[in-house]
Amino acid sequence: MVIPGMKIICAYPVNLDALYDLGEERISRFIQSADPSGIKSEMKGSIRSREDLISSLLYCIQHGSGAEILVESLQLAEEIEASFPWSFRLGGNAGIMANLLAELGARPILNAPALEPRLAALLHPGVGIPVSGRLMQPSLAAERPDLSSEVLHFVFQFKESDRIPSPQGPISAAKDNRFIATYDPVNTRMVSNQDFDAYCQDHIQEIDGAILSGFHLAPRDRYREIFPPRIEQIRSWKEANPNIYIHVEMGSFQSQKIARHFLRLLEKADSLGLNEDELETATAEYSAIGSSPVSSTVLSTVLSTARPKMSQWQERVQKAAGLREHLGIFRVSVHTRDYILSIMEEGKITAKEELLSLQKGADAAAALAATGSAKGMPPNEVNPRGLEAKREFCRQGAEAAGVGRGAFHKRDGLVVSLMPSLLAREPRITVGLGDTATAATFYKELQAIKRDRI
């Protein structure tokens, strides 16, 4: 049974992404224009200079990790923009997810306080922008002068084995990934306009879900004033409509201190999503305050091993389970390059429905990487590391049930699910894969929840 036109709030960040595929000659000139004594392969808390940008970029390349870091000044942002030949595409977690949800048949309600014509042209016409109590197509909403302001994020994409020069010698990329340098006074403040706030509050009873992100963009010196209004907004939605299904994406925070503050405010959310790097930050948070991972029967079975130490996927299951218990929420999911896993309570969704939802997300992300479109044909090859993790998962006991490409384990009120990714050998896109997987998974989950209520 198809649930037509589900209304889903998408907030908060939407912007233009300026993309650059790293090329040795151009990046060499940029590095040569900086002070070599200020360049070291290390992650900076923010970007105050060319040297900070290069140091953080080299760190991500060397470790194959992704990150998003704030650029501190408009002047530096203009220097970065002038230094590379950029291509432009839709960016911002909320914008990417709203577009995909509209393609899937939902009716997304997008917060877009900085909507100018070039950005509006990249949004699906099925995305609704609240204006004066009604939803308008993006192209029409962009004609309003109070919504017009251009926002750019600089995305440096790199591929495995790319070689980049540095003052300490060439550095080779460990994995495909991206580094994002952001100067964005709108999304970093998590701004929402009055029309969006009023529409959501007035129509909350008819809204089925909300998928929220952008908390990681808050500056170090302002997060304590930025978070409370947004968390209060989530609380008001949940109290007015207890059936609304709310998923929050964590993002790459500038510091563990900000991450700790954010996680303590999440009791009204149903679900939290993270990538593998963000999981490390989040679990450092609960470890730091003395919470320990759960030791339920289902987890002790899943994590049993004859090896001297647990496999990486088992460690991530343990950390995700501990985080879910610490937060007291329904579900935690972790999307990695090799697989997507989730830990959830039984009740809202069956184990099979969750696994099919994860497969929907993994397939959409793989299709986007391989073809440039989430609705394209996904590749056939299963990620070998993800497949091996699934096989180990199924070897943990008879309770692990293989369903299609993935598997789940259900016991004592908890469900652990693992879905291997598909492998795009020559990816066309590396940005927005996590958002795509998250939105497609969320849509499938919400369909299952709605079916159960009918």
Role assignments for model-derived ranges:
Residues 1-431, 435-436, 442-454:
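Ribokinase/PfkB-type carbohydrate-kinase core domain
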